[in-house]
Amino acid sequence: MGKFQVLDHPLIQHKLSIIRDKNCGTREFRQCVNEIAELMVYEVSRDMPLEDVEVETPITKATTKRLAGKKVVVVPILRAGIGMVDGILELIPAAKVGHIGMYRDEETLQPHEYFVKMPDDLENREMIIVDPMLATGGSAIMAVDALKKRGAKSIKFVCLVAAPEGVKAFREAHPDVDIYSASLDEYLNEDGYIVPGLGDAGDRLFGTK
């Protein structure tokens, strides 16, 4: 069974508080989302395997540790997920980046996929899907479906805020996938927004309405 983990590090919670504020401007919102993602990847990558590597220091030869095995692919769900990519790449600069494009029907709240672009050999890669919000869970579930259909076997989902309804739906659909969030919020309102949430992350990241 995949785990659901809230990352409650003080720095993450501090920056999350900043972006919850409706008066947080686009520039600061974008910067904090990037920084939160960078802080979160420390925990998300905790179980990545290491291998011994021989290096020569200025003093002598030494056996050191480096990431081994599967190559990482960061997969933002367009468009809001893009805001989390650079923070992860700061710590895993060799990661590849795939993209999944989805939009949500404002009446039914159901997601619709319109674009998927991935590297080859997903079965040999560690996939990290990123999206600031886990609301109904529909987009996240569909994103995992798309990756599994293309052969991915090792998948993690990372978000900033999650609603209990979305977590429940996601875990029922994909019990093998770990979920990491900076917060578990209270509930979804009738418009499908997370409460208290942080509004429309895509609009706030890109200065649109």
Curated annotation (Swiss-Prot):
SUPFAM superfamilies assigned to the protein according to its UniProt record, in alphabetical order: PRTase-like (SSF53271)
Lineage top rank: taxon: Bacteria
Class of the enzyme per the UniProt entry, highest EC level: transferase
Annotated positions binding 5-phospho-alpha-D-ribose 1-diphosphate: R79, R104, D131, P132, M133, L134, A135, T136, G137, G138, S139, D200
GO biological process: UMP salvage; uracil salvage
Cofactor(s) this protein cannot do without: Mg(2+)
Biochemical pathway: Pyrimidine metabolism; UMP biosynthesis via salvage pathway; UMP from uracil: step 1/1
InterPro entries: PRibTrfase_dom, PRTase-like, Upp_B, UPRTase/APRTase, Ura_phspho_trans
Keywords per UniProt: Allosteric enzyme, Glycosyltransferase, GTP-binding, Magnesium, Nucleotide-binding, Transferase
Binding site for uracil: I194, G199, D200, A201
Gene3D superfamilies documented for this protein: 3.40.50.2020
GO molecular function: GTP binding; magnesium ion binding; uracil phosphoribosyltransferase activity
Pfam entry (one): UPRTase
Catalytic activity, EC: 2.4.2.9
Cofactor note: Binds 1 Mg(2+) ion per subunit. The magnesium is bound as Mg-PRPP.
Task of the protein: Catalyzes the conversion of uracil and 5-phospho-alpha-D-ribose 1-diphosphate (PRPP) to UMP and diphosphate.
Family: Belongs to the UPRTase family.
Protein name (record): Uracil phosphoribosyltransferase
Species for this entry: Ligilactobacillus salivarius (strain UCC118) (Lactobacillus salivarius)
Gene this protein is translated from: upp
